[in-house]
A protein has these predicted regions:
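Short acidic-glycine motifs
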Residues: 1-181
Length: 181
């Protein structure tokens, strides 16, 4: 117990009484967007277009308890690397002065990898608790320990995370215009 207790900081605001720890920090936040669109007028009746959008983001924070992690001001304790791609192609074709055909096809993909601040660190020996963690780096890290109403240690249970989400969409329309437009 004393090895775990050594990871908890002393109170930083004695005026508020025992157990009050406050800290400020700025989370990591770096987002880059790249967008482009191309229009091609195949003829006076047919317009074809395509667009590309890519966002890369590195977002994260550092836990206030150091190696014991805990909460991270403005973020979760760790680092997330995300890429979102959004691509689409479409067209509009004037078949007659009163009949228009249009359509669009879209694709969206999100790749995300999030690792906690303590990812891969083995605390079994440091804390003297055999059996915590395992051979896989995803099983390691500081254990989640809560003491009363205080903020606990470790990273949120959903970390680490690796995911790829993709979606496709398409829509096609034929419009008939009646009368003056």
């Amino acid at each position: 117990a004393s090895k775990i207790q050594a990871f908890f900081p002393n109170a930083t605001n004695e005026a508020l009484g025992q157990g009050n720890f406050s800290i400020g920090a700025t989370p990591a936040f770096n987002r880059r967007y790249h967008d482009g669109k191309l229009n091609f007028n195949r003829n006076e009746k047919h317009n074809i277009w395509g667009r590309v959008g890519i966002m890369n983001a590195i977002v994260g924070g550092t836990g206030v308890f150091g190696d014991a992690v805990g909460p991270a001001p403005g973020s979760d304790p760790g680092l997330g690397d995300t890429q979102v791609q959004n691509h689409s192609v479409g067209h509009s074709y004037t078949l007659t002065p009163t009949l228009i055909l249009d359509g669009v096809f879209g694709f969206q993909r999100m790749d995300q990898v999030v690792q906690g601040q303590d990812f891969g660190k083995d605390f079994a020996t440091t804390l003297g608790i055999p059996g915590i963690g395992g051979p896989d780096p995803r099983e390691k890290g500081f254990p989640n320990i809560g003491i009363g109403s205080y903020n606990g240690t470790g990273v949120p249970g959903w970390m680490p995370l690796e995911r790829i989400e993709e979606s496709f969409t398409t829509s096609h329309n034929v419009r008939y215009l009646k009368g003056a437009h």
